[in-house]
Every structure is written in C-alpha cells, then in structure tokens.
Amino acid sequence: MRLQAHSTAVVAVDMHRGHLDPSVATLPLAPERCALVIARAADLFQKLRAIGVRIIHVVTEYRESEEISSNPFWKAIHDDPAKARKGILRHNLAGSKGTEIIPELYAEGDLVVREKKRYNAFYATDLEFLLRRLGVDTVILTGINTTTCVLCTAFEATNRDFRVVIAADAVDSMDGEEMHRFALRLMEASVGWPLSNQEILKAFRAADRDHLLR
C-alpha cells in the first residue's frame, strides 16, 4: 500500500474524555486500555502531523438527553446494569467534561467536528464536506469503539468511495477484546485495511520513495 500525505486524513472518532478518562467517563474503556490506546494514538498523530497529514477529531455531543433517548434501543438499556452502555442517557451532554478531546491527542491546527449524534461519524455532520474540501480520498480511522462508531464510520466511508485504513493500534472497544478483534476482521473482509502504526508509516515512506524514483 502507498499513502500520500496530501490526500490522506486521520479521522479520530470519539477520542474524548467521555470514553478515555476514567475519572469522568460515562461510557468508559477499561483504565489500562485507555492509557494504551492514548499512547499509541498520540505517537501516530505526532508522526503523521510531521509529514503534513491532517488530523480531524469527531466528537459526540448532545444538547440534552432527549437527543439520546430518541433512539429506542438506547432508551431501553440506559438503566440496565448488565449492559456496557448503561447510563448512556448521561453521555457527553453539552458542557460536560466528557466532550473534551484527550489533551495528548490534540494539537494546534487539528480540525474538530462536534455534531456527531449517532454511531456513524458522517451522519448529520459536515465530515464529508470537510474531507472533500481538503482533497482527501483516504481516511485513517482511529478511536472508540471499534465495534460501533469506528465500524459504522468505516462502512459509511467506503459507501462514499473513500479508501479506508483502520489504525489497528489506535482503536479499541468497551465491548471487550473478542468483539474488538471481530470488528477488525469484519472491516478487513468488507471495507478496508487494518494496519499497525508501523505499517501505516511504512506506507507513507513507500509513496515518498516512489516519488523520488520518478
């Protein structure tokens, strides 16, 4: 694979405190997994920014809980202690600390899309408008959860004819390792390429070598 900085962007899906800061998260990833995915994503973002790749953070944010409870499944499970998404009606309400992007992952010059209301980061947001304006044809997806928002966004990106790379080291799921791995396999079979950080950086270096040989 060859990746070119001018036509590639990272779409960081819900890498905010609502999932990744156990002290305030309403739908938390396990603490040890938070630290790992943050460290891996921060390293990848820093190296990609250095070669000119744009980082776009997409953040779930609701004006009020009724915007969440209008989904019948979420309304049904919000107070079920057996469900991973219990308490979802309190998740990332406007003004809450959960809506803040993890500081280690944000840098000046990054772009932010805050309209996300459902699993698909394209739905009712200006994400596609932004990608097209930037001349992007390839997206590198990172974020939480592999099993929901990353998965749905990957399928929608391929439906809109973007080339999809999933940064396998920089995604994770509150649904556990087995479901996380299944989601990666499903995306690999259907919509795109799960690559490690090392493989992603290698793909950019390969494109640079091709350019020098012309």
Task: Name each model feature, range by range.
Residues 1-9, 43-51, 68, 73-214:
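Active-site-adjacent betaalpha module
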Residues 6-8, 24-48, 52-55:
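A short alpha/beta connector and helix-capping loop motif
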Residues 9-19:
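Acidic-leg catalytic submotif of subtilisin-like serine proteases
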Residues 12, 53-60, 66, 167:
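Short beta-strand segments at enzyme active-site cores
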Residues 16, 61-63, 145, 171:
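Catalytic metal-binding/acid-base residues of hydrolase active sites
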Residues 19-20, 174:
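Catalytic P-loop NTPase motifs of RecA-like helicase/translocase cores
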Residues 20-21, 106:
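A short local structural element in Rossmann-fold oxidoreductases
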Residues 22-29, 70-71, 157:
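Surface-exposed, active-site-proximal loop segments in enzymatic domains
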